[in-house]
Amino acid sequence: MKRSRILCLVLVLCLLLAGCGNAAKNSENAEQENQTVQSQMETDDTAGENESAADAQEAVKDNTEDGQVIHTAGADVSLSDLSYQTSDNNAPVVFFTSDISSEGLIAIYQALDWKPTGKVAVKVSTGESERSNYLRGDLIADLVQSLDGTIVECMTAYGGNRAEIAKAKQAAEDHGFTAFADFDLLDEEGEIEIPFDGGARINRAIVGSHIDDYDYYLILSHFKGHSMAGLGGGIKNVAIGMSSRSGKVYVHSAGTRTTGNIMHNNQDAWLEALPETVKAVSDYLGEGRMVYISVMNRLSVDCDCDGNPAEPDMHDIGILASFDPVALDQACVDFVYAAPDGGSLIQRMESRNGIHAIEHGEEIGLGSRSYRLEIIDE
């Protein structure tokens, strides 16, 4: 009996010890499971935090890109305010610098990586009077000389100081152009007609006969307003600036005549004749033979053909350059709209429907209104 009790006690003790062992093991397993779950939760939390951080960084990146501030020569503007600017790599590039100086002009020319060979003509407006806002020699001389370029121009069709050979040459001298470069009136010895069948308004461009004396053309323009076209940039500098006197009348009349005054009775029609003339000239010269730079300073509502222009009431912006004249003019327009003080020039452009020349330029394949802005400033 005593032995039986002892055996029972031993059995109970063994059972108790086994239970404690299983409990300890279960407790250990539970602890391991808890640690695994906790670790997984921490991992998930970390992943979520990292994902949220990445999303936040991407959002900041997107906001930075959309709201990138462009430092112009005057007031800053937002990249997102340039209506036709795009990130599409297939869009034509428009280069920009806020440095309106001889050095800035050379820098933006170099950004184009244009490699002209042979004779280079530089098409500028030589200005109607000393009060006109034409590009001054201290700004453009170094670039023109680096190209061994010849300043070219045509006579005007509205009278004034450049309506005759002697007067036009005298104006170029008086305004300082002959001090740093040769000067050539493209229509001094007459004109030639360039056939064109890709437009709605004209069937030819009538330009100065010296056009064939040059292998490449740098279209160096002063962007501003215009009393008839609303705005003047690269398109107008070619369409009117390279046309002979009768060619100018032909453009202004939207292809209806070559004599008489330059007044017109169909605003949109004559605006369409502008890019059509540029397309005719560009096709005639060949791809890559023309490049465009526009300087956005002294932004008057009036053209450089005006001898007594209105004083600018907005800040300077910068210098822009492109192989595409439509993209370049559109970018200049976008900068005016983005500027906080562009109201007067905007009113001038809109009152003449000046944007229509750019619209039609895209329609006929002269270029693209959409562009990719590349800022060359450091």
List the predicted regions and their residue ranges.
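Bacterial N-terminal signal peptides that target proteins for export
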Residues: 1-7
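Serine/proline-rich low-complexity intrinsically disordered segments, especially terminal tails, linkers
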Residues: 6, 29, 41, 54, ...
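Sec-dependent N-terminal signal peptides
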Residues: 7-15
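C-terminal motif of bacterial Sec signal peptides marking the signal peptidase cleavage site
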Residues: 17-19
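N-terminal, intrinsically disordered, polar/charged segments of Gram-positive cell-envelope systems
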Residues: 24-84
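Extended, low-polarity segments enriched in aliphatic/aromatic residues
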Residues: 74-141, 146-378
